[in-house]
Amino acid sequence: MLAQARTLTEYLREQPDGWLSAHHLMKSLRHDTLRAIPAPDAQGRTRIEPPRADQRALLKRLYLQQNWTEMLETADSTFSRGANHLWLDLQWYIHQALTKSGQETLADIIVADLKGLLTRLAGLETLAFSD
């Protein structure tokens, strides 16, 4: 199902003003299906593998280069892979890319979506990956 959703989101992104629809489709599949936060250990770490170092480095580099378009595409694409939907930094990168490229309305929607997720899954923001 996730592979089919990726195909559909690629199509939607290519449509005029289709980014938000594509983003919400993937976010619905990845976030709205979560029923509880991952079980943490005593230090607040989960057994979930962290984002790859190259993914972290790429997003940092794109931010420093102020390449907002590529940063948005990279963060959005990364979100759909592995356990990256739990990597809340991606929401920050998406928000930054939208804000810095003058798309404040979309950035506000990202904030509202994240507030909803954190309200529904209280404590998610306190967790850490296994590293």
Predicted regions and their residues:
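Terminal low-complexity "docking" segments
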Residues: 1-131
